[in-house]
Amino acid sequence: MNPLAARGPHRVTLATRADCSVITLTGDMDLDHVGPLRAALQEACTAPTAPERVVVDLSRLDFCDSAGLNALLHARSLCEQNRRTLTLTDPGPQFYRLLRITGADALFDLSYPGTADGWPDAAR
């Protein structure tokens, strides 16, 4: 397991593959749990040897507040500065609603691999 991973039901794991870095979020991502996410995003978005593509897997995320969203917005900026791409995959209804309410849905590359057309039911 990656040393950046937080312990307990709220976890952040970073796995580096040949073509991308994958950050998986589990549980809640709020002010109390955002530190490991920031560290993983910093590494994936700025490390000289990291792949050019960063994927954040949200399929196990139960809740996200403004602290988690802020970390992802900062990561988007870091990726742009370092010529990397950032994709958020499989966001659930709560997170997708947070993106829509804040207008951040237009800022991120969103992927829904579990649907036939790549879009969530909420976006139709």
Name these PLM-found stretches.
Residues 1-62, 74-124:
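STAS-like cytosolic regulatory interaction modules
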Residues 65:
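ABC-family nucleotide-binding domains
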